[in-house]
Amino acid sequence: MYTDPIADYLTRVRNAAKANHKVVEIPASNMKKEITKILFDQGYILSYKFEDNAVQGSIKIALKYDKVTKESVIRDIQRISKPGLRKYSGSSTIPRILNGLGIAIVSTSKGLMTGKLAKQLNVGGEVICYVY
């Protein structure tokens, strides 16, 4: 049993991308579904599919690769706020990742969103991860 399911999710995606897997299957939760939707909307993954089992369900993610270099679009994905050390950021202090080339995923009172959208809505929250 793992103590940080979000870190497990990010690690599975990172490892699958580094190993050039086309699809990765991950146990589902509402937060993982929202992170997956954000990654899809921002163009980091090709597609996703939620499968409901009797107990928990799973998420199948099709990873996206560059057509020329055959490298993963996800260069790195880092967990920032951890269960033992939460990292919060106000709307004015949400970081820009790689000068705007990456995204920060932030958990706000209005739900999970990118750091850019959180700045536009003027809300802060817990910085879940960086993707670039």
From Swiss-Prot:
The keyword Cell inner membrane does not apply. One of its GO terms (cellular component) is ribonucleoprotein complex. Transmembrane segments: none annotated. GO terms for biological process: translation. One of the primary rRNA binding proteins, it binds directly to 16S rRNA central domain where it helps coordinate assembly of the platform of the 30S subunit. Belongs to the universal ribosomal protein uS8 family. HAMAP family: Ribosomal_uS8_B. This is Small ribosomal subunit protein uS8. It comes from Flavobacterium psychrophilum (strain ATCC 49511 / DSM 21280 / CIP 103535 / JIP02/86). The lineage of its organism: Bacteria, Pseudomonadati, Bacteroidota, Flavobacteriia, Flavobacteriales.
